[in-house]
Each structure stands twice: as C-alpha cells, then as structure tokens.
A protein has these predicted regions:
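Patatin-like phospholipase
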Residues: 1-63, 76-280
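Catalytic nucleophile serine of serine hydrolases
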Residues: 68
Length: 280
C-alpha cells in the first residue's frame, strides 16, 4: 500500500515549526471506508504504537471521531488495549458469513453480536473515561420513520440522493447528523446537528447504528439520543463534513484523492468538502 501525505496550510506551518510528536495531534478522523477499513486498522495500530495519540501538555485529549466502520476503528483505539481490540474487530469482521441475500434483520442481528463480542461491557467503561482519547461516534437520524424492509429503504434513499444532488441543503430533508460522545459539554466544538451523550448503556447501539448501511441493516434506536431511526453515519459524514476541533493537527487517513462530505457527494465529482476543513 502506497501512502500519500497531504497537509493544509495551517497544519503544514505547525509541522514546520514544531514537528510531529506526542501531544501534537488534536484529532484522528475515521471516515466511512467500507471494507477498506481493514487496511486502515494497521495504520491505526501504528499510530497508537507511535505515541502520537496522547493528550497534550495541557491535558487536552485527542479526539477520536468516526462514522460507519471508521467509528468502530476509533472505538477500538479508545479501549485500554487498542491492539487487542483492533485484532478482535478484524477477526470478527472477516469471519462474518451470510447467505447470498440476507435480510436486513439477519445482518443487524449478526453485527449486534459482533460488536458485543469485540467490545464487551467491561471494556465500555474505559472507552468512555479514557484520559488520553475522547471518543465521538457519528450517526445519521432519518427525518421521519425509516422502513425496516430493503425496498422501502432504497426508495427513500434514492429520493434523498436526488434532493442532495440538486443542492447540499437537500440532505437535511432526509437525514440529520448526530454526534454521540461522553460528556458532550467537554467536546471542543459544537457540531452542526444534534449532540447526545455516549454511555455504557447506548454504546453498542450507537456503534451499530453508525455502521448500519441503508438497504442492508434495519434502523437502530439509541437510548438518550433524540427519538428516531438511526443509520450509517457515513450518510451525512462520509469523509469530513464539518470541523471537529479548532486546533491543528487533524489526521484524516482515507482512500482517495477526493474528500467528500456525505455519502451522496462521493458520487458527485464536483461536490467536495470545504477547503477550509482541510487547513488543519
């Protein structure tokens, strides 16, 4: 795998002035990458081993914010033993086996079991109280009821694609972003959309919802979040759709030359994330 490093102007200025070392990274973003996350898991392992993902001299934690499978990677990095958690996640994901045409109910049940296996309850407490890393999980809430059956989901998804293609604001007619994090009042920036607490009681549902690809999963309800049906966080935040912090340096490992805001935008070559988002 070939790695290409790119830096925005503010990030580059800081790198030249201070270098890159422990306490210099303010956030790591885990975008929605589909199965490609398996390759990025090895990079996550290396970042953890390097010591880059540690709090700065003022005690400000590194933000780990992810959507879809990126949220699962970030959750593994928030555990007390990230290498072991990443290994469990990779192994459990690869072992998944389905009939040629599984129902959304079957897929949802399987991944609910997977996430509870990878992140058992005793681990959840540390994930939410980690003194070095602050976990944030992005999910998308459907505006109105979201069907459980594939045909109804795909119909609504196609409508959302059409309205988003006409104008980026059209996405809000179908989906609303929600960020779940422990102690929301300590998150450095107020993201657009809703913010809800991430707790041991809703952690597994939040992670399941963040990876619930429309058409393949049933919608998920999340206790403590605004009432509604939740699904894949990559719908609203595919690569990077909003600032996650006001400090450099933000690491955004992803798989292509473009940075798209929403899942729909990845299919629109003229629609890229704001250049300002990439400055840090």
């Amino acid at each position: 795998m070939t790695l290409l490093y790119r830096a925005g102007s503010r990030a580059l200025a800081r790198l030249r002035a201070e270098g890159l070392g422990p306490g210099k990274v303010s956030a790591l973003v885990g975008p929605a990458t589909g199965p490609r996350w398996l390759a990025f898991a090895r990079l996550d392992w290396a970042l953890h081993q390097s010591g880059l993902l540690t709090a700065d001299e003022e005690g400000r934690r590194v933000l780990l914010v992810g959507a879809s499978a990126g949220a699962w990677r970030m959750a593994a990095l928030a555990t007390a033993e990230p290498e072991a958690a990443l290994d469990r996640l990779c192994a459990a994901y690869i072992r998944q086996s389905f009939d040629p045409d599984p129902s959304p109910a079957e897929v949802t049940r399987a991944y609910r079991r997977l996430l509870r296996e990878v992140f058992p309850n005793p681990i959840a407490g540390h994930m939410l109280t980690n003194l070095e890393r602050h976990l944030g999980v992005i999910v998308s809430r459907a505006v109105g009821a979201w069907p459980k059956h594939r045909s109804g989901q795909l119909l609504l998804f196609a409508r959302a694609f059409a309205t988003n293609a006409l104008h980026p604001s059209g996405l809000a007619r179908s989906f609303r972003r929600t960020l779940l994090c422990a102690h929301p009042g300590t998150w450095p920036l107020s993201p657009s959309g809703d913010v809800a607490p991430l707790t041991p009681e809703n952690l597994h549902d939040a992670l399941l919802a963040s990876g619930s690809v429309p058409g393949y999963f049933e919608p998920v309800r999340i206790a403590g979040a605004p009432a509604g049906d939740y699904l894949d966080g990559g719908v609203t935040d595919y690569h990077l759709a909003q600032p996650v912090t006001d400090r450099p340096i933000v690491l955004l490992p992803h798989h292509g030359p473009r940075v798209a805001a929403s899942w729909f935008d990845k299919h629109l070559p003229w629609r890229n994330s704001s250049a300002e988002l990439l400055e840090d």
